[in-house]
Amino acid sequence: AYKIEETCISCGACAAECPVNAIEQGDTIFVVNADTCIDCGNCANVCPVGAPVAE
């Protein structure tokens, strides 16, 4: 599953690209639901700051 690092700027690009809706706005940054994530990498591909990383 992917994890979103603290470099996240909360732009929402990742959530819009997630085919299984595994990403949502957290308290300060976006968060990935690891149980739902299918490791497709779409979030990492569209993130302008490279915050999503594979775990």
From Swiss-Prot:
Molecular function via GO: 4 iron, 4 sulfur cluster binding; electron transfer activity; metal ion binding
InterPro entries according to UniProt: 4Fe4S_Fe-S-bd, 4Fe4S_Fe_S_CS, 7Fe_ferredoxin, PSI_iron-sulfur_center
UniProt xrefs under Pfam families: Fer4_7
Binding site for [4Fe-4S] cluster 2: C18, C37, C40, C43
Cofactor binding note: Binds 2 [4Fe-4S] clusters.
Keywords (A to Z) from UniProt: 4Fe-4S, Electron transport, Iron, Iron-sulfur, Metal-binding, Repeat, Transport
Protein name in the entry: Ferredoxin-1
Reported function: Ferredoxins are iron-sulfur proteins that transfer electrons in a wide variety of metabolic reactions.
Superkingdom in the source lineage: Bacteria
Chain ranges of the 4Fe-4S ferredoxin-type domain: 2-27, 28-55
Residues binding [4Fe-4S] cluster 1: C8, C11, C14, C47
Cofactor: [4Fe-4S] cluster
Gene3D superfamilies: 3.30.70.20
Source organism of this protein record: Rhodospirillum rubrum
